[in-house]
UniProtKB/Swiss-Prot annotation:
Topology class, membrane: Multi-pass membrane protein
Enzyme Commission no: 7.1.1.-
Species this chain originates from: Chlorobium luteolum (strain DSM 273 / BCRC 81028 / 2530) (Pelodictyon luteolum)
GO molecular function, one term: quinone binding
Name of the protein in its database record: NADH-quinone oxidoreductase subunit H
Transmembrane spans: 34-54, 106-126, 139-159, 178-198, 217-237, 269-289, 313-333, 352-372
Catalytic reaction annotation: a quinone + NADH + 5 H(+)(in) = a quinol + NAD(+) + 4 H(+)(out)
Membership in a protein family: Belongs to the complex I subunit 1 family.
Keywords: Cell inner membrane, Cell membrane, Membrane, NAD, Quinone, Translocase, Transmembrane, Transmembrane helix, Ubiquinone
Pfam family, one: NADHdh
PANTHER family to which the protein is assigned, alphabetical: NADH DEHYDROGENASE SUBUNIT 1 (PTHR11432), NADH-UBIQUINONE OXIDOREDUCTASE CHAIN 1 (PTHR11432:SF3)
Entry keyword annotation includes Transmembrane helix: yes
Main localization, broad class: membrane
Subunit annotation: NDH-1 is composed of 14 different subunits. Subunits NuoA, H, J, K, L, M, N constitute the membrane sector of the complex.
Length: 372
């Protein structure tokens, strides 16, 4: 595990010495001598990105839903209601943190925390540009796929610990849904890994760079890539409990699902984990199939659009914008498609997506072997 950053010759010497001192001081507390100071420093931008995604993700969803329902949405707090989410955060901070008398207090308390950790640990391997990645693992894609299992533990702990039948029903539905759809999602991502020849997410980005912009992206290099791309996008909706796969939180059936009994900051943490997962799966789609931090603009003659929009800052801009685009599509689908029944959801997974995922895997292998 390493922290990769481009050298900054203009960085003040005092700042460099301070960071080295903090890193040396914290190294002894990290497992296997890992420079914990660097990991803490690397985590700071990720925290801001996550909070940014939450703040404007919630605001964006309210505005999108209002537009589709011919409403204005939030308008009172700040210009065009842009501070509404901050007002909601302040409201949640003031709400009482209630623990039901009959609840298993240990499971009830750790459930949101485990869910949050499972959602945001994947951010460590997401490359937000050629100059920055928290943990450059050579199996980063495999890590991102597997870390979802922690979310299952958190959801089940929250549902069981609440000692509420609606919460338990919602947790069981969510666990069954996530575990089932993880199979076609993983196979679809392995198709992208097969095209790249590596599980290193930074290397996957590098292999999709070039002067022709989007023409170098895996999605446009092979006509077969569209199949695993669509399979993973559909499966990611189910993994994040987004419509039309939101049966674990069906208000008309289960009140609010596995977080029915939660209030205050515990509810806010669950909410943060949900929007963090939305951005995480959107970023993975962008990295594996759409070039990640690479610019989609091509060089056209003497107009070097790709060269002008490439670099560390541009890289972060492109991957965040691509991620937000897929978040917008998720929100769009929520207010467009009706909710599936449980039997329809499982039918789609096991009899449609999973067989097509295996077919796409075989076709991708054939394409990589026989097509130069």
């Amino acid at each position: 595990m390493s922290f990769n950053a481009l050298p900054q010759s203009s960085m003040p010497l005092l700042m460099g010495n301070s960071l080295n001192a903090w890193s040396d001081a914290l190294t002894g507390f990290a497992p296997m001598g890992l420079p914990l100071g660097l990991l803490v420093i690397a985590a700071i931008p990720l925290v801001f990105i996550a909070l940014y995604a939450l703040t404007y993700g919630v605001y964006g969803e309210r505005k999108i839903s209002a537009f589709m329902q011919d409403r204005l949405g939030p308008m009172e707090v700040g210009k065009w209601g842009i501070l509404q989410t901050l007002a909601d955060i302040l409201k949640l901070l003031q709400k009482e943190d209630i623990v039901p008398t009959s609840a298993d207090k240990f499971l009830f308390v750790i459930g949101p925390g485990v869910l949050f950790v499972g959602s945001f640990l994947a951010f460590a391997v997401l490359p937000f540009g050629p100059a920055f990645i928290g943990a450059n693992l050579n199996v980063g894609l495999f890590y991102a796929i597997g870390i979802v299992a922690l979310e299952v533990v958190g959801i089940l702990a929250a549902g069981w610990g609440s000692n509420n039948k609606w919460a338990l029903y919602g947790a069981v539905r969510s666990v069954a849904q996530i575990v089932s759809y993880e199979i076609p999602a993983a196979i679809a991502l392995l198709c992208g890994a097969m095209m790249a020849g590596t599980l290193d997410m930074q290397e996957i980005n590098v292999l999709q760079s070039g002067p022709w912009g989007f023409a170098h992206f895996f999605l446009f290099q092979s006509p077969i890539a569209w199949l695993p791309f669509l399979i993973y996008f559909i499966a990611s909706l189910a993994e994040t409990n987004r419509a039309p796969f939101d049966i674990p939180e069906a208000e008309s059936e289960l009140v609010a699902g596995y977080f029915t009994e939660y209030s205050g900051m515990k509810f806010a943490v669950i909410f943060l984990a949900e929007y963090g997962s939305m951005f995480m799966v959107s970023a993975i789609i962008a990295i594996v199939f759409l070039g990640g931090w690479n610019s989609p603009l091509p060089n056209i003659g003497s107009l070097a659009l790709n060269d002008l929009t490439t670099g560390p800052v541009w890289g972060a801009f492109w991957i965040i914008m691509k991620g937000f685009f897929f978040i917008f599509v998720q929100m769009w689908l929520r207010w467009t498609l009706p909710r599936l029944r449980v039997d329809q959801l499982m039918y789609l997974c096991w009899k449609v997506l999973t067989p097509f995922a295996f077919v796409s895997f075989v076709l991708t292998a054939i394409w990589m072997i026989y097509v130069p």
